[in-house]
């Protein structure tokens, strides 16, 4: 019977050492000179590596969980040879950090993770962007509006109006909410100066306006007018003002997020607001203050004329009474200015009061005035401003204008069938709705089960996701309108207030809560992701937006991957 070999206590020797020791032992006459059968060795013990958690790189000794892979977007050695045609959102980087390796040589190297184990990598990323809030890439610098482009007379003297949908483009930049609204209004006015004015369109026909006021403040339900004669110059919420035939279209624009106007079903196609949609949002007309004050002044003058006629008949008596009062006026001495202890009146004032009382007693009794019917004050709507621009009243006897406000229709219109039923008033987002970004490491991470391997950037498997690091920052400025007025004279921003005499076309007031767009670096921990067992020396890193496009506004992209064993592959 074949006897088993005896070994010292400890870990079993390797298979190669046992096989090579058998002939030597037989030659020396060892008791174990019988030929040995190959022992059974489990598959997980077949390799002379440093362990199941070993990481082998090139000809170096195996390492144990000490390797970190750094993904850097602007390594100087990678720029000329790997990234000359790439940007910070789609780049190649060498993960072999030896200085004596060129990018070409590093691309031939690999980092091998022990294939008897399942490996994962803890992925942490740092992302920094420098994206303005108004730009073409994010569809935030354009919007469409339906405006009047022509006014003419037909052969039978009928007014013919022509409307067209026009696309307006804003200059790119990082603007506050107030400045963006001013630029939108300025784009409409510039189109009027270029097209509408040349075709007979009046200034009062500018039918699209973005504002921030509540035009119903000061509304009197009895007269149906805004009784102060002016609209309250206070910002409440961004608003859209339309004339008949006009409208705005945000189907391919994200500027509606800046205005705080959204759809209740945001995933439905199209976003167009027309004049007919704003039913119940007509802006009330202003009181004609000049006519009202003139009517009151006429009543006063008529009353004064009647009294004057009575006094003229007794002009001699009036002169005599005045002369008597002058004669009775005492000569003031030095003690007349002393203040007594029981009253604040001086002696001179007391004497003067006594003289006036004596003069009234000496004057003849005044004739009783004949009461006349008092004239009612004139209360009528203001039809035009001081520059003869019409306020577009619905009719001569109406107290409402043809202008319709989205804000008024939303708050005062029918909530069941009006604009409130399918639009939503929300907080203005000066970032115009920041989207998400996706991280892809196609050469390092195993493809998730929901993706398949591909070479197209727009279809790279996604291994991480985060919000675009662009935030809306708000602060309170109680003197916003005052600052706006000062800047109008110092920075010459009166170009945004081309019609200051018109209460509707005037520049909208700045809100007290000012919001700006800010790029804030983001540090994100994406958790543990499954790694490939063989990692190439050159890795591709791709950051795509919600439409799976590389983002040119990525300013810095860093990634750190820490490999570790997740579980055994052979158990």
Swiss-Prot record:
Motif (Cell attachment site): 340-342
Region (Disordered): 298-324, 347-383
Biased composition (Low complexity): 314-324, 356-368
Gene Ontology cellular component list: host cell nucleus; T=25 icosahedral viral capsid
One Pfam family recorded for the sequence: Adeno_Penton_B
Miscellaneous field: All late proteins expressed from the major late promoter are produced by alternative splicing and alternative polyadenylation of the same gene giving rise to non-overlapping ORFs. A leader sequence is present in the N-terminus of all these mRNAs and is recognized by the viral shutoff protein to provide expression although conventional translation via ribosome scanning from the cap has been shut off in the host cell.
Domain notes: The cell attachment RGD motif is exposed at the virion surface and is involved in binding to the integrin heterodimer ITGAV-ITGB5.
Record's protein name: Penton protein
Name of the gene: L2
């Amino acid at each position: 019977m074949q006897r088993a070999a005896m070994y010292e206590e400890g870990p079993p020797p390797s298979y190669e050492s046992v096989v090579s020791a058998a002939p030597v032992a037989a030659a020396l006459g060892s008791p174990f000179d019988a030929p040995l059968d190959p022992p059974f060795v489990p598959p997980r013990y077949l390799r002379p590596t440093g362990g199941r958690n070993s990481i082998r790189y090139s000809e170096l000794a195996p390492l144990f969980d000490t390797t970190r892979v750094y993904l850097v977007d602007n390594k100087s050695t990678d720029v000329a040879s790997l990234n000359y045609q790439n940007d910070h959102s789609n780049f190649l980087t060498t993960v072999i950090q030896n200085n004596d390796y060129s990018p070409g040589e590093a691309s031939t190297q690999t980092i091998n993770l022990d294939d008897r184990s399942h490996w994962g990598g803890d992925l942490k990323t740092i992302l920094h962007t420098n994206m303005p809030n108004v730009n073409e890439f994010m569809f935030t610098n354009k919007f469409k509006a339906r405006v009047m482009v022509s006014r003419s007379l037909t052969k039978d003297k009928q007014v013919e109006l022509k409307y067209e949908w026009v696309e307006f483009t804003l200059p790119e930049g990082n603007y506050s909410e107030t400045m963006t609204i001013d630029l939108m209004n300025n784009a409409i006015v510039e189109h009027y100066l270029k097209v509408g004015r040349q075709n007979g369109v009046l200034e009062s026909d500018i039918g699209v306006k973005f504002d921030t006021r509540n035009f119903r403040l000061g509304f009197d339900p009895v007269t149906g007018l805004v009784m102060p004669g002016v609209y309250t110059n206070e910002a409440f919420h961004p608003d859209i003002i339309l004339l008949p035939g006009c409208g705005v279209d945000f189907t391919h624009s994200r500027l509606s997020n800046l205005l705080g106007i959204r759809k209740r079903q945001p995933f439905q196609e199209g976003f167009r607001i027309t004049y007919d949609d704003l039913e119940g949002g007509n802006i009330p007309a202003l009181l004609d203050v000049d006519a009202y004050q003139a009517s009151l002044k006429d009543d006063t003058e008529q009353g004064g004329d009647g009294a004057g006629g009575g006094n003229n008949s007794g002009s001699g008596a009036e002169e005599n009474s005045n002369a008597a009062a002058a004669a009775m006026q005492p000569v003031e001495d030095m003690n007349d200015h002393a203040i007594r202890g029981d009253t604040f009146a001086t002696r001179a004032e007391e004497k003067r009061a006594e003289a006036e009382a004596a003069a009234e007693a000496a004057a003849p009794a005044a004739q009783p005035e004949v009461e006349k019917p008092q004239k009612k004050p004139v209360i009528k709507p203001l039809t035009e401003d001081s520059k003869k621009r019409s306020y577009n009243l619905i009719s001569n006897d109406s107290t409402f204008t043809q202008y319709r406000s989205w804000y008024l229709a939303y708050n005062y219109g029918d909530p069941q069938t009006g604009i409130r039923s399918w639009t939503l008033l929300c907080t203005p987002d000066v970032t115009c709705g920041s989207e998400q970004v996706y991280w892809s490491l196609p050469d390092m991470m195993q493809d998730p089960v929901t993706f398949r391997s591909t070479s197209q950037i727009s279809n790279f498997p996604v291994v991480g996701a985060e919000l675009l690091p662009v935030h809306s920052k708000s602060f309170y400025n109680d003197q916003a309108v005052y600052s706006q007025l000062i800047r109008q004279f110092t920075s010459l921003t009166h170009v945004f207030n081309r019609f200051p005499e018109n209460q509707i076309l005037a520049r909208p007031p700045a809100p007290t809560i000012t919001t700006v767009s800010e790029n804030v670096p983001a540090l994100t921990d994406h958790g543990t992701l499954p790694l490939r067992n063989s990692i190439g020396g050159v890795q591709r890193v791709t950051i795509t937006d919600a439409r799976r496009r590389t983002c040119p506004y990525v300013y810095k992209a860093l990634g750190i991957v820490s490999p570790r064993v997740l579980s055994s592959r052979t158990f």
